[in-house]
Regions:
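Class II aminoacyl-tRNA synthetase-like tRNA-binding/catalytic domains
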Residues: 2-246, 250
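Residue-level recognition of alpha-helix termini/interfacial anchor residues
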Residues: 12, 276-279
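Generic non-transmembrane alpha-helical segments
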Residues: 144-152, 264-275
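A translation/RNA-centric and nucleic-acid-associated enzymatic feature enriched
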Residues: 162, 172-270, 281-460
Length: 460
């Protein structure tokens, strides 16, 4: 049916004053008085609602159900200047048509409902202001990511979802099979040989290895797609399925990729600030006071940089009684990351030169033989959002790293060939979309940044 988008009315009110319009949407609230009634209507095109005025001398009786929160309606009327200071335009209704009734047991009628409760209703929570705003920001953020790379000449590539190798070498892979359990198979090798691919297969944990293939032909590429990790991590920062951005750049060393990552983060955060003002206002008011200023600091301030070894010394001298003890060689936990970002630096910080045993096999070894040219970008309130590294270009060192981790050499032969035929220094990083979305919105749980979150014992 033909109708006007509420976004158009609210953003360009002068074009619609004293004109007949038709709007469709869902009732967010209904207020009644003796002679007048007021509907807050939202059609999903924008976060703010449109006020519709019902003059009871014009519409003496509303259709049954057309006053209930959640019901969908079509309203025809005239757009006029609003007396409401918060909105320039409103609609004086001439007719109201019920499109879809919403019964009284609608579970999200209350204006304020806890996030914990809404997580039990993933199919309905997107209708609330909070989740409407989250996924609007997610959309803008996604397009800003593409825009950043496209403006700089990167090739967008699609990497496989089903893979035969574990990019991270950690064994946290969801297996893909067409057989299921069958006691006739006496070994894993026999089972895999009879399966669809004739070998073990799983969902991708990263598109990086394939991304490196493309970077050796096109120079600058990026991937942006779903990633899967079978990690039994029931935390507010981990999900089994998430979207990841992974650029790969030929002829780039670690300092080059840090510079690219810095420019990238500033660009996409600035896009959110400029393109989502209503949404940021909502998050600033209800979820993280000072959010807008925090994001402006990201855009305007320099990022800090600290060597892993120095970071360990800072943590050891802090006097803090950390749950996880701090020693050189330990993996930084959330409490350590938050202390560095929130207390020591009060801004994003790159921690560089991690111990090689903490990082993936493909990262370039530093001359000291103990650390790798790798860095994590930590941000206040969230912790790690980006992992960067220069890739190991030395075939012998790469072979040894694969052996040391007990990985199957044949799975990585194509990857090793990249070093054999015209290898170059190259680097890349990975950013989880949901992590940066948490940071940009002030959300404290990654499950609130995904429409249908996937985690341990959670598949709705």
């Amino acid at each position: 049916m033909k109708h006007n988008d509420i976004k158009d009315l609210l953003s360009r009110p002068e074009e619609y004053f004293c004109k007949d319009v038709t709007v469709c949407g869902w009732i967010r609230s209904y207020r009644d008085s003796k002679n007048m009634a007021f509907i807050a209507l939202n059609d999903g095109t924008t976060l703010p609602h449109l006020q519709v005025v019902i003059d009871k001398s014009v519409i003496p009786e509303m259709p049954d159900g057309a006053t209930r929160v959640g019901s969908s309606v079509k309203i025809e009327g005239m757009a006029v200047k609003s007396l409401n200071a918060n909105q320039a335009i409103e609609v004086n209704a001439k007719t109201v048509t019920l499109l879809g009734d919403c019964p009284l047991d609608y579970p999200i009628q209350k204006a304020k409902t806890s996030l914990d409760y809404l997580r039990t209703l993933p199919h309905l929570r997107v209708r609330t202001n909070t989740f409407n705003a989250i996924f609007r920001v997610r959309s803008k953020l996604s397009f800003a990511i593409h825009r950043f790379f496209q403006e700089r000449g990167y090739l967008y590539v699609h990497t496989p979802i089903i893979t035969g190798s574990d990019c991270e070498g950690a064994g946290k892979i969801f297996k893909v099979t067409t057989i299921g359990y069958d006691p006739k198979y006496k070994s894993e090798a026999e089972y895999n040989a009879d399966d669809f691919f004739g070998q073990s297969a799983g969902l991708t944990v990263s598109g990086q290895l394939e991304g490196e293939v493309m970077a050796t032909a096109f120079g600058k590429i990026y991937t942006f797609g779903p990633t899967f990790r079978a990690e039994n991590s029931n935390t507010t920062r981990h999900a089994a399925e998430f979207w990841q951005i992974e650029p790969e750049v030929a002829f780039a060393e670690i300092d080059d990729i840090i510079e690219i990552a810095t420019e990238f983060i500033k660009y996409i955060i600035n896009a959110v600030l400029n393109e989502c003002p209503d949404e940021i206002n909502l998050f600033d008011k209800f979820y993280e006071k000072g959010l807008r200023e925090k994001l402006k600091k990201v855009v305007d301030d320099e990022f800090a940089r600290v060597d892993y070894t120095e970071a360990i010394e800072i943590l050891k001298k802090s006097g803090k009684d950390f749950v996880y003890p701090v020693e050189w060689g330990c993996d930084l936990q959330t409490e350590h990351e938050r202390y560095l970002t929130d207390v020591v630096y009060n801004r994003p910080v790159f921690v560089v030169n991690y111990p090689k045993d903490l990082k993936s096999f493909y990262m370039k070894q530093n001359p000291d033989g103990k650390t790798v040219a790798a860095t994590d970008l930590l941000v206040p309130g969230v912790g790690e959002i980006i992992g960067c590294s220069e890739r190991e270009a030395d075939t012998e060192k790469l072979l040894q790293a694969i052996k040391d981790r007990g990985m199957k050499m044949s799975d990585y032969q194509n990857y090793l060939d990249l070093r054999k035929y015209g290898t170059v220094p190259h680097s890349g990083f990975g950013l989880g979309l949901e992590r940066i979305l948490m940071y940009a919105t002030g959300m404290g749980n990654i499950r609130d940044t995904i429409i249908f979150p996937r985690a341990k014992d959670e598949l709705r």
